[in-house]
C-alpha cells in the first residue's frame, strides 16, 4: 500500500503570478464624465445602435467623452459572420427601418457632430446590398446638418459596382471600405468577402470619383508577417486609396479568432512611416479603429492637402 506524501504546512504557499492579459500599452484608464453620459443619453433616446457598443469598441468611453459616435446603419443584424466581429448575424435579418435616417440625423444634430461616420452591417439579402438605405441617411443628414461632412464605412456590396455608384453619387466626403487583413489571412478572417474583391471595389471608387477621399483599414495581431503588411499598404496605395488605419485586433470573446500577437507601439509607428513613404496618410496604433478620431483624420488630410 502506497503512503500519501505528507504536506509541509509550515512553508507558505506560493501563488504563481499569472501573465497580464494585455501588455502595458493596452492598459489605460477609461475616461467618463458629463460629456460621456450626455452622449450615452442621446444615443439611447435615438434608439440607434452604434458600432461603438455592438462591436465592443475599446474606444467608446474616449469617443463618447468627446461627444462623437459612429452609427450602425441598416439594422444591427449582419448577413455575414466574420471571425473577428461581435455584431449579431443571421441569413434573414429584419427589414430596413424607414425611421432610421431621421433618427440618425436628429441624434447627430443633437450631438452637434461636424463629421458624421456611418458604418453598416452587410445586407446581402438586399438586391443593392443596402446602398439606397445609406443614401437615404446621407440625404437626411444633409437636411439636418448641411455643413457636416460625412463618412461611410461600407460593405463590399458583393462586388455590385452599380450599388457602389449609388452610394458615391450621394456626395459623401469619405468612402471607407476595410480590407481588414492581409491577403493570406483573408479567407480565415472574413466571411463571404475576399481580399481581391475589396481591392476591386476600392479601385472602382477611385476610378469613378478621382477626387474622393478613399479610406481603408487593417487589423494586425492575427498572424500576419511584416512583409505582408507592407504589401497590403502597397496594394492600397497603387489603386488610389489615400487614408489607411492600422489597429490591434482584440478578441471580443472566446468564440472569436485568437490574438496571435500584440503589436508594439514602435511597430505601429514603423508601419506608419512605411505607408507615408508610399504617399498614404496612415493612422496607426494599438487602439486605432476605422472610425476612431475620424474627424481629426479628415482635418489632418485636408491640412496636408492645402499645405
From Swiss-Prot:
Chief place where the protein resides: cytoplasm
Occurrences of domain Radical SAM core (ranges): 64-281
Keywords for the protein's UniProt record, in alphabetical order: 4Fe-4S, Cytoplasm, Iron, Iron-sulfur, Metal-binding, S-adenosyl-L-methionine, Transferase
GO CC terms of this entry: cytoplasm
Pathway connected to this protein: Protein modification; protein lipoylation via endogenous pathway; protein N(6)-(lipoyl)lysine from octanoyl-[acyl-carrier-protein]: step 2/2
EC number: 2.8.1.8
Xref: InterPro entries: Aldolase_TIM, Elp3/MiaA/NifB-like_rSAM, Lipoyl_synth, rSAM
One MF annotation (Gene Ontology) recorded for this entry: lipoate synthase activity
Note describing how the cofactor binds: Binds 2 [4Fe-4S] clusters per subunit. One cluster is coordinated with 3 cysteines and an exchangeable S-adenosyl-L-methionine.
Enzyme class: transferase
Sequence positions that bind [4Fe-4S] cluster 2: 78, 82, 85
Ligand binding ([4Fe-4S] cluster 1): 52, 57, 63, 291
Cell compartments where the protein resides: Cytoplasm
Requisite cofactors: [4Fe-4S] cluster
Cystine crosslinks: none
Reactions listed under catalytic activity: [[Fe-S] cluster scaffold protein carrying a second [4Fe-4S](2+) cluster] + N(6)-octanoyl-L-lysyl-[protein] + 2 oxidized [2Fe-2S]-[ferredoxin] + 2 S-adenosyl-L-methionine + 4 H(+) = [[Fe-S] cluster scaffold protein] + N(6)-[(R)-dihydrolipoyl]-L-lysyl-[protein] + 4 Fe(3+) + 2 hydrogen sulfide + 2 5'-deoxyadenosine + 2 L-methionine + 2 reduced [2Fe-2S]-[ferredoxin]
Source superkingdom: Bacteria
Pfam families xref list: Radical_SAM
Similarity comment: family membership: Belongs to the radical SAM superfamily. Lipoyl synthase family.
Record protein name field: Lipoyl synthase
Lineage of producing organism: Bacteria, Pseudomonadati, Chlamydiota, Chlamydiia, Chlamydiales
Gene: lipA
Amino acid at each position: 500500500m502506497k503512503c500519501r506524501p505528507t504536506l509541509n504546512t509550515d512553508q507558505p504557499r506560493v501563488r504563481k503570478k499569472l501573465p497580464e492579459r494585455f501588455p502595458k500599452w493596452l492598459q489605460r484608464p477609461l475616461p467618463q464624465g458629463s460629456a460621456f453620459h450626455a452622449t450615452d443619453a442621446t444615443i439611447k433616446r435615438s434608439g440607434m445602435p452604434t458600432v461603438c457598443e455592438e462591436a465592443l469598441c475599446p474606444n467608446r468611453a474616449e469617443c463618447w467623452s468627446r461627444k462623437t459616435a459612429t452609427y450602425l446603419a441598416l439594422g444591427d443584424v449582419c448577413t455575414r459572420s466574420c471571425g473577428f466581429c461581435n455584431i449579431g448575424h443571421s441569413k434573414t435579418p429584419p427589414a430596413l427601418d424607414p425611421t432610421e435616417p431621421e433618427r440618425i440625423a436628429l441624434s447627430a444634430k443633437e450631438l452637434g457632430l461636424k463629421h458624421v461616420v456611418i458604418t453598416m452591417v452587410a445586407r446581402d439579402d438586399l438586391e443593392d446590398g443596402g446602398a439606397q438605405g445609406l443614401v437615404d441617411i446621407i440625404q437626411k443628414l444633409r437636411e439636418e446638418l448641411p455643413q457636416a461632412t460625412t463618412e461611410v464605412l461600407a460593405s463590399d456590396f458583393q462586388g455590385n459596382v452599380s450599388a457602389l455608384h449609388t452610394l458615391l453619387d450621394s456626395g459623401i466626403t469619405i468612402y471607407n471600405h476595410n480590407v481588414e487583413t492581409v491577403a493570406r489571412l483573408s479567407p480565415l478572417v472574413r466571411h463571404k468577402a475576399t481580399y481581391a474583391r475589396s481591392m476591386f471595389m476600392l479601385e472602382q471608387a477611385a476610378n469613378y470619383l478621382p477626387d474622393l477621399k478613399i479610406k481603408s483599414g487593417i487589423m494586425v495581431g492575427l498572424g500576419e508577417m511584416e512583409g505582408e503588411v507592407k504589401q497590403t499598404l502597397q496594394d492600397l496605395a497603387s489603386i488610389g486609396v489615400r487614408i489607411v488605419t492600422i489597429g490591434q485586433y482584440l478578441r471580443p470573446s472566446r468564440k472569436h479568432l485568437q490574438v496571435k500577437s500584440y503589436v508594439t507601439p514602435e511597430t505601429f509607428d514603423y508601419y506608419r512611416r512605411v505607408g507615408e513613404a508610399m504617399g498614404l496618410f496612415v493612422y496607426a496604433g494599438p487602439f486605432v479603429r476605422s472610425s476612431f478620431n475620424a474627424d481629426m483624420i479628415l482635418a489632418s488630410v485636408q491640412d496636408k492637402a492645402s499645405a
